[in-house]
């Protein structure tokens, strides 16, 4: 299978550090990196952080992913999308760092769409740095949707330790907009696409899907909102003969009682409804997967952590798990179409 592309993220955050630690750990544990990666970003930034971390990784610049095969397993190949014009300043917001992080994503996505890379794993970007660079996007998900000309990709979060998976019906939007988006979205298509992705990407033959309500107590029969009765429940009923889907459940009791363990995936109506319990349960190991794209993309479920950038304190566990999952999903898709 082809190589995976790891994007460097914001060069003033922990992205370069967790990439280097993941690569170094893989070399020390197996003698070779399992995912056979290339890094898309800045060779200078990787060399800078490698020195700060006291690592002796052999970093080489290449101009095409196919050239990575010519190097020994211990070499970390890098495709540069640009180099910083001034000394690196870990923990600071920079338009240049934002621009380089987005250029890396664009390059990796294009390599995947061209069939030259099997998957992409993205290190964290900083939203303010991206905005300063002139990009209107709020994160990876909507940027990749534009690059892939795809409508409404799904954010899914997975904990490889417990198996917990949470999908979001809406993503990075202000809370006051959630009800209108729930009413305007094609919820039936959302659930059908989610079901299909779980089958193809995770090899779950009959996914068990739990759906949370939007309102407190799932509105208690319409006392605290009408979205459950008018939108969510009719959609679940219409799909029940084709999918293993149940709900809507009150979010607090659902997670508090551990009922989520009875399902393959839980669908939350908005960002914090799903991510708050997920991060409590899987802060160090959680992975973000973007479903509904014509490419495989995973990422660690954390941000740039500017407060510890460049200090050698960042945990690479989530990125390492994201790299493993990207390889697994790419393999599953390859087998499905072989």
UniProtKB/Swiss-Prot annotation:
Entry GO CC: cytoplasm
Principal subcellular localization: cytoplasm
Reaction catalysed by this enzyme: 4-(phosphooxy)-L-threonine + NAD(+) = 3-amino-2-oxopropyl phosphate + CO2 + NADH
Protein function: Catalyzes the NAD(P)-dependent oxidation of 4-(phosphooxy)-L-threonine (HTP) into 2-amino-3-oxo-4-(phosphooxy)butyric acid which spontaneously decarboxylates to form 3-amino-2-oxopropyl phosphate (AHAP).
Swiss-Prot/TrEMBL cofactor(s): a divalent metal cation
GO molecular function annotations of the record: 4-hydroxythreonine-4-phosphate dehydrogenase activity; metal ion binding; NAD binding
Organism (species): Prosthecochloris aestuarii (strain DSM 271 / SK 413)
Other noteworthy facts: The active site is located at the dimer interface.
Family affiliation: Belongs to the PdxA family.
Subcellular location(s) per record: Cytoplasm
Organism domain of life: Bacteria
A Gene Ontology BP annotation from the UniProt entry: pyridoxine biosynthetic process
Involved pathway(s): Cofactor biosynthesis; pyridoxine 5'-phosphate biosynthesis; pyridoxine 5'-phosphate from D-erythrose 4-phosphate: step 4/5
Key words of the record: Cytoplasm, Metal-binding, NAD, NADP, Oxidoreductase, Pyridoxine biosynthesis
Binding site for substrate: 140-141, 279, 288, 297
Protein name, UniProt field: 4-hydroxythreonine-4-phosphate dehydrogenase
Primary enzyme class: oxidoreductase
Cofactor note: Binds 1 divalent metal cation per subunit.
Catalytic activity, EC: 1.1.1.262
Assembly behavior: Homodimer.
